[in-house]
Regions:
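A short, exposed helix-loop element centered on a Lys and neighboring polar residues
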Residues: 19-20, 64
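A conserved structural motif in NAD(P)-dependent oxidoreductases
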Residues: 109-120, 131
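A glycine/serine/threonine-rich, flexible loop-to-helix segment
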Residues: 72, 84-108
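Catalytic Tyr-X3-Lys loop
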Residues: 1-16, 31, 35, 52, ...
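Conserved SDR Rossmann-fold cofactor-binding beta-strand/turn motif
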Residues: 76-86, 128, 141-143
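Alpha-helical segment proximal to the catalytic Tyr-Lys
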Residues: 24, 68-72, 133
Length: 147
């Protein structure tokens, strides 16, 4: 139960409070963008990770709900939901650089590769740009087709 409370605090309460701190200024300007980086796992589920999936799913729900609440103030709220992105925290270089290990890691990804951090950065830049002004309440999976 303490682990669940900690996960909810980090993945739901903190983003909620951060968004709440920014919204008054955005409302004054009658414009703004809030972009959460969540996870693709709630879009599909993941055995043995129900606590994480639940917390991340709540963050996705927060994005959709805030989009409904804040749209009238010209504030767009979206979320990028990555999974299977190259990162030494999740995929150590010794595994990524080993063809057998990489094949095992990517076997469930339709595109058969890991995403690159710069691809996530480009997606974030798009959502932060004027090109995304008519997009709100969207959860964008970034998982090579896995979710």
């Amino acid at each position: 139960t303490d682990d669940l409370r900690s996960a909810l605090e980090q993945m739901v309460v903190f983003p909620f409070e951060m968004a709440g701190a920014m919204v008054p200024q955005m409302k004054k300007r009658k414009s703004g963008k809030i972009l959460f980086v969540t996870s693709a796992t709630p879009l599909r589920g993941l055995p043995n990770y129900s606590m994480y999936v639940t917390a991340r799913g709540a963050t996705n729900a927060l994005a959709v709900s805030l989009a409904q609440e804040l749209g009238r103030d010209n504030i767009q709220v979206n979320a990028i939901a990555p999974n299977y992105v190259e990162s030494p925290n999740y995929f150590p270089p010794e595994l990524v650089n080993d063809p057998k290990s990489l094949a095992k890691m990517t076997r469930n990804i339709p595109l058969k590769r890991l995403g690159k951090p710069e691809e996530v950065a480009a997606l974030i830049a798009f959502y932060a740009s004027d090109q995304s002004d008519f997009i709100t309440g969207h959860i964008m999976p970034f998982a090579g087709g896995w979710a």
